[in-house]
Design a protein with these regions (language model features):
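Predominantly extracellular/secreted and cell-surface proteins with exposed
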Residues: 57-118
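Extracytosolic secretory-pathway proteins
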Residues: 8-56, 60, 102-181
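N-terminal acidic, proline/glycine-rich, low-complexity intrinsically disordered segments
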Residues: 1-7
Length: 181
């Protein structure tokens, strides 16, 4: 009888993240949405908890620890920070906080975040489906690059203006820098 425990395989893009955790998650949401939003006279970005804007117009969320497994067997890559977009005198309000990249044992990848869409209370939901596109970055600080599309639940985040499957901006997970030898 074989009593050897089979450990679940880890997608290749996660290997650099396991020892020390993700460095940060960068995502622009959707460029056309940002263009529309920034034309509104009362638009405001409120970034806190470590979230920051990037030179390209996207947003960076810092890592908050090494990936873990949840009760369903998903790898959870956690990030921190809060982004709130408001305009139209408060009628437009989008919250994206403490994003998590979820990786299934079969390799499916999605993005969840705390949003303000369930009966006016913050709740976590999957907002984007991610597809691994390859690696980049520097040798001591590799990156995993993803294309993104709007998830079924994510369409509610944008008040029905975009639909499940619509393309979103690409996403990048950057690992913590490896120590120099």
């Amino acid at each position: 009888m074989n009593t050897e425990v089979q450990l679940p395989t880890v997608p290749a893009f996660m290997e650099p993240l396991l020892p020390q955790g993700a460095g940060d998650f960068t995502w622009g949401i959707k460029a056309s949405f940002r263009t529309y939003f920034e034309r509104l006279p009362d638009h405001a970005y409120d970034l806190s908890g470590g979230a920051e804007g990037t030179e390209s117009g996207g947003f960076r969320f810092p890592g908050r620890g090494a990936p873990t497994r949840d009760e369903n067997g998903l790898w959870v890559i956690p990030f921190s920070g809060r982004l709130v977009l408001t305009a139209h005198f408060g009628a437009l309000s989008v919250l994206i906080a403490d994003p998590e990249v979820l990786v299934s044992p079969q390799g499916g990848v999605s993005l969840s975040a705390i949003v303000d869409e369930v009966e006016g209370r913050a709740a976590r939901m999957v907002i984007a489906d991610l597809a691994f596109e390859g690696t980049g970055g520097e040798r001591l600080s590799p990156e995993a690059n993803f294309s993104a599309s709007l998830a079924r639940d994510g369409q509610y985040l944008f008040m029905g203006n975009y639909y499940a499957g619509d393309p979103l901006d690409p996403a990048i997970i950057k690992s913590q820098p490896f120590p120099q030898e």
